[in-house]
Regions:
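A structural signal for multi-pass alpha-helical bundles of membrane permease subunits
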Residues: 2-271
Length: 271
């Protein structure tokens, strides 16, 4: 290895090291802060403390922690499951089926990505209010069931699915849904894993829409509960960081369970 190559590799490793520290430090600081009192967090203490149990006791006494946690998990799992089914069917159909109008429809779907969700909140709220969907899982789920990004990801990956296999399956008498569920889905585990992690994370962290339609304390989610901990006068940062730490647990579990396919799915979706 030449001197220039060694210097280049050294610089690359230094850059990767700095990037890793910058990425990991906020997570580590959050864990440390969850074990300390608020005054220690404000003072910049960077060592583990012994106040996690006290923070937990204060949290459960002031907020409906576990009902909010289970609400978030329930809504998020429902959104993820239905979004994967709807978006994968749409992406598959846009790529596999031949129709003169499909490209125009697909263009409209992609153009909708340019509309910020904030601009749609008021009309959606009025519509859901008249339909009686406020404070309900259905009302929380519907705006996330068919996102343009997921449809685009599934369509891009459907390009790699051999059309000859589909034609052969049709000749053998397999239905269209049979082709999709028995052939397409098993061969596209990577993109489903990537889409699942993306959808799960977005749904779990969905604060704005949840705040808009979930006015009942029995239906509030973790982001809403965390916002209740932030006060204009006194904020217990140790308790706040513990709540944030608990919120990250479901996403971490899903990511590590699907990490085998996650990177492959992300790289495949941008071919």
């Amino acid at each position: 290895m030449s001197v220039n190559s060694k210097v280049k590799m050294t610089l690359i490793y230094i850059f990767l090291g700095i990037t890793t520290v910058v990425s990991v430090f906020p997570l580590l600081w959050m864990i440390i802060a969850a074990t300390n009192k608020s005054v220690d967090v404000i003072g910049g203490k960077l060592t583990f403390g012994s106040s996690m149990l006290e923070n937990y006791q204060n949290l459960v006494s002031q907020q409906p922690l576990w009902s909010s946690f289970f609400n978030s998990c329930k809504y998020t799992l429902l959104v993820t499951a239905f979004a994967l089914v709807v978006s994968s069917l749409a992406g598959y159909a846009f790529e596999i089926y031949r129709d003169k109008a499909k490209e125009k429809i697909y263009a409209v779907v992609l153009m909708s990505m340019m509309i910020p969700f904030v601009a749609l909140m008021v009309p959606l709220f009025r519509m859901y209010s008249k339909l009686g969907l406020l404070n309900s899982a259905v009302g929380f789920m519907l705006p996330s069931l068919a996102t343009p990004l997921l449809i685009m990801m599934f369509r891009t990956n459907a390009k790699a699915f051999p059309v000859d296999i589909i034609e052969a399956a049709r000749i053998d008498g397999l239905s269209e849904f049979g082709i999709f569920f028995r052939m397409y889905i098993p061969s596209m585990k990577a993109i489903f894993a990537a889409a699942a992690v993306e959808t799960f994370m977005n749904a779990l962290n969905n604060y704005l829409w949840a705040k808009g339609i979930m006015s009942d304390n029995t239906t509030q989610t973790m982001p809403m509960m965390i916002s209740n901990l932030i006060s204009g006068y006194v904020t217990d940062y140790g308790m706040l960081m513990l709540a944030v730490l608990i919120t990250t647990i479901p996403t971490a579990i899903v990511f590590f369970a699907l990490q085998k396919y996650f990177v492959e799915g992300i790289t495949g979706s941008v071919k």
